[in-house]
Amino acid sequence: MPENIPTSPASSVAAAPGASNAPEDPAKRALQALLPEFYAAVGEFEDLKAAPGLSPEAVAALEKKLEFGFSKELRELLTRCAAVSMAGLSVKAAEFGPIVMPGSDALIIGEFYLYNPGDRLLMLPDDPAVYYLEQRNGAITQMADGVFNFFNKTLVKYLYSD
């Protein structure tokens, strides 16, 4: 996975008493509140970007447009952060779309550069799990049992593994 660089070497230093660790950007604050373990691991990365959430009505309209029912966790993520991206990861509601594979009803929810650029993150109908599609060989692997565990557990593990 591509490397990220914290914005400051002091990121591991404890904050002064009474100082807030909350980011100034409202979308990043929402990301921190929803996915605390993920944010603790990546909050200082220079290239971390988060976009403000969508309204519940906009999320419902996106589900209707894509003809795909989102999991409860994906809906919650989208109402807090419509996009999360950094080197090697991109999950953006505006880029969601059906996968072009015969006989598949999967939805592409993003890109995750674990092995190769352009590998995809997928969700399946009526399944809250997050899957990884390796473009090179077409292999599909379950990454996590849900969106929150994907960010808070799986991504954190991959970021800090050798």
Task: Name what the model sees in each region.
Residues 106, 147-148:
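A generic alpha-helix preference that emphasizes hydrophobic side chains
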Residues 129-147:
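A short, surface-exposed interaction/processing loop segment used at functional sites
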Residues 2-132:
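A surface-exposed partner-binding patch
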